[in-house]
Amino acid sequence: MNRSEALTYLITELGRENQAYQNLAIPVDDDEKRSLLRALMNVREPGPISPALLAVQDQLLQPEVRAKGIVALSEIETVNQWRARIGGPAGPFGDKLSLWQGDITRLAVDAIVNAANSQLLGCFVPGHNCIDNVIHSAAGLQLREACYQQMKQQHATEPTGQAKITAAYNLPSKYVIHTVGPIVTARLTPELEQDLANSYRACLEIAVANQVRSLAFCCISTGVFRFPNQAAAAIAIATVRAFLEAHAEKFERIIFNVFLDKDFAIYKKLLI
């Protein structure tokens, strides 16, 4: 089955699962097919998935991940390497910290962090470019199902400042660590700052418990959760450094992954 046939098959099979989508017109253009498939994956509720569908999905997603360019840990310089390159002194835990700008789903590290919502099932908005949607879309339908199985045992929504870990499925990382950061609805408060620190700490703790040696953090809560970027970066770095004071031997590398230029500038100023 070629790529175009795989797209048609997956759209057809996902359409059959939901009566509302059974009569969807399948586009001729492969890019339009791919957009439709992502939308159908995004809105699919958790539930049993046929092995045949998963096999075709995986055959589609894995080449897409490779085509984006998988980034190995060895390709990302540490803070100290960066500082040395520009003639600066070593920084606190600079041999274990990195700043990297780009798509977190490209990173071949032990675990990446997903900024989730309290349902912990991924983003259901078709084609939305939040990190929750991007990670779930690249990992595959298995990720939502894995999250659902954990949430089903919990019988409640996920509290702010905690973390859960799942396999990463079609991503180049081994695991995804999911955390719900605080939502800033009005002004920033000490309680919200503590909640964000708790999210970072919970991710670090669950990473250690699962022998994760290389971990990439996204910018938790700075998107639709409206946490101020500067304050969030300062909390992220301070929390990670404080954790390394007691657990430095547990990690080979912790990466602060940013996507926006403004976040890159903020982290660079704080780290470099």
Task: Describe these PLM feature segments.
Residues 1-272:
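Macrodomain-like recognition of ADP-ribose-binding/processing modules
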